[in-house]
């Protein structure tokens, strides 16, 4: 009995230690303060994932869609590289994605509701006969480029990593995500598309969400959601 309890405790600790969160924006290679420009969410201290793609939590995480007034907005330039820190590191296999949504006014007043989100980044695995290798595996920060033709204004910047280690059963994928607030200048007249809503962009049975990544080894993988708008 004792050895079984020790095994269970160790397994739970290992699972928890693999969880992660995106607490801060990165600009010019330097991390900003945790939850200064990124909306904090209920339970963020536990680094836990969202598992229901039909819930409001899939937008900016738990209770984060409506707490923008507690968050500052970071000035950025179109074409600039912006990132997020990872606490402590990306500990599960899966794709990394980034979305933006234009606020009608101040980002702090914007809840991100409706078909307003467009994808600016995604990565995928290297596929071999031996399995899938993910470029974000173990990352302690992640970076994306703000599209150069993006119109000026305030935006929500949503980072998301989808952990697929348990995705062989419906509801087994884990979504680690945060939303930052940025104000873009120096942009252009681009028309970001396609636009999607969160919740709504994903279905629990999408092939990029419901998938066994271990056996049989997939021959290809496409992340869920719309195509990337590069501007």
From Swiss-Prot:
- Would you indicate the residue range of the signal peptide? 1-18
What is an annotated GO biological process for this record, any one?
A: cellulose catabolic process
Q: How is it used?
A: Lignocellulose is the most abundant polymeric composite on Earth and is a recalcitrant but promising renewable substrate for industrial biotechnology applications. Together with cellobiose dehydrogenases (CDHs) an enzymatic system capable of oxidative cellulose cleavage is formed, which increases the efficiency of cellulases and put LPMOs at focus of biofuel research.
Gene Ontology CC = extracellular region
What enzyme category does the UniProt record give?
A: oxidoreductase
Q: Which residues bind O2?
A: 165, 174
Reported function: Lytic polysaccharide monooxygenase (LPMO) that depolymerizes crystalline and amorphous polysaccharides via the oxidation of scissile alpha- or beta-(1-4)-glycosidic bonds, yielding C1 oxidation products. Catalysis by LPMOs requires the reduction of the active-site copper from Cu(II) to Cu(I) by a reducing agent and H(2)O(2) or O(2) as a cosubstrate.
Q: What is this protein called?
A: AA9 family lytic polysaccharide monooxygenase C
Which source organism does the UniProt entry give? Emericella nidulans (strain FGSC A4 / ATCC 38163 / CBS 112.46 / NRRL 194 / M139)
The encoding gene: LPMO9C
């Amino acid at each position: 009995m004792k050895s079984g309890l020790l095994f269970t405790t160790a397994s739970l600790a290992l699972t928890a230690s693999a969880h992660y969160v995106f607490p801060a924006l990165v600009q010019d290679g330097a991390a900003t303060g945790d939850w200064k420009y990124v909306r904090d969410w209920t339970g963020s201290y536990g680094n836990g994932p969202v598992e229901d793609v039909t819930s409001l939590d899939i937008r900016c995480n738990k209770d984060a869609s409506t707490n923008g007034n507690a968050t500052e907005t970071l000035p950025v330039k179109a074409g600039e590289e912006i990132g997020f820190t990872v606490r402590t590191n990306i500990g599960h296999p899966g794709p990394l994605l980034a979305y933006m949504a234009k606020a009608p006014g101040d980002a702090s007043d914007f809840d991100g509701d409706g078909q307003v989100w467009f994808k600016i980044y995604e990565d995928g695995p290297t596929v071999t006969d031996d399995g899938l290798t993910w470029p974000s595996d173990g990352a302690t920060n992640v970076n994306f480029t703000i599209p150069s033709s993006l119109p000026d204004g305030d935006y929500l910047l949503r980072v998301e990593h989808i952990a697929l280690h348990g995705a062989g059963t419906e509801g087994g994928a884990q979504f680690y995500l945060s939303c930052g607030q940025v104000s873009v200048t120096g942009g252009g007249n681009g028309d970001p598309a396609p636009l999607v809503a969160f919740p709504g962009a994903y279905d629990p049975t999408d092939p990029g969400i419901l998938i066994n990544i271990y056996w049989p080894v997939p021959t290809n993988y496409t992340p869920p959601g719309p195509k990337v708008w590069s501007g």
